[in-house]
């Protein structure tokens, strides 16, 4: 993963200095070098448990549940869940001019630039390499075609899982999100009960309520307002639908329509991924 992060950083730096044409050449060259390095390390560091490396990406609109399902799968498969949203929030919590610039972007519902995301991700991959992590599940990256091309050039993504949910349910979920200011736990106070589309089954998503010790400490993220959420959804569709097409054309995209809440959706997602629920182990019930 150190090779991946170095190549990502090199590609980002090249993109800020040169034209798109020259950047593409440097991306390809860096990708070839990184691919060779990853291949060598892969032969030496095969996963002992089942011999398989997991290098997956989760796509989906803000609030769809990428973090929830990616986290459960990371526990089940014992690979790190790397959420770029968490990387951004950690950076926001660090004092200084960079966090102030980042806060202005996020609070206005804009997507963070490629360069910022790539640098944050690169740092996280380097830290993981130092700890001996094998594989990863990415959540929130890539969000643009350029990011997808950089990632494609430096590592093999096995699978891209595109979670889909009706927009009115997405809006309700985003507005219902809460976080415990003490433990950092994520919860949702929204209770969603909607008629099915085109005669389909009714959609019910119960709230994910906090334990008693967290109830008085719940806070709302500053970017979870109706105006900002709608803007984020619009920006997502403009930028990320081409990313879906990018992976669909390569035969790597699995589109999964969430039928309801976690109890209903989780076993069906495992079935779609050909994973045995009996191997779930530490994943939440």
Swiss-Prot record:
Q: Region annotation LID: residue ranges?
A: 176-224
Which InterPro entries does the entry link to?
Adenyl_kin_sub, Adenylat/UMP-CMP_kin, Adenylat_kinase_CS, P-loop_NTPase
Spell out the SUPFAM superfamilies in the cross-references.
Answer: P-loop containing nucleoside triphosphate hydrolases
- Give the catalysed reaction(s), semicolon-separated: AMP + ATP = 2 ADP
Please provide, alphabetically and separated by semicolons, the GO molecular function terms listed in this UniProt record. adenylate kinase activity; ATP binding
As for subcellular location, the record says: Plastid, Chloroplast
Keyword terms: ATP-binding, Chloroplast, Kinase, Nucleotide-binding, Plastid, Transferase, Transit peptide
> Which EC number(s) are documented for this chain?
2.7.4.3
Q: What GO cellular-component annotations does this UniProt entry give? A: chloroplast; cytoplasm; mitochondrion
Pfam families cross-referenced by the UniProt entry: ADK
Q: Which residues bind AMP?
A: 84, 89, 110-112, 140-143, 147, 221, 232
Q: PROSITE patterns of this UniProt entry?
A: ADENYLATE_KINASE
* Transit peptide extent on chain: 1-33
Q: Region NMP: what ranges?
A: 83-112
Predominantly, its location class is plastid
> What Gene3D superfamilies does the record tag this protein with?
P-loop containing nucleotide triphosphate hydrolases
Tell me which residues bind ATP: 63-68, 177, 186-187
The UniProt function text for this chain reads:
Catalyzes the reversible transfer of the terminal phosphate group between ATP and AMP. Plays an important role in cellular energy homeostasis and in adenine nucleotide metabolism.
The similarity comment for this entry is: Belongs to the adenylate kinase family.
Q: What is this protein called?
A: Probable adenylate kinase 6, chloroplastic
Organism of origin: Oryza sativa subsp. japonica (Rice)
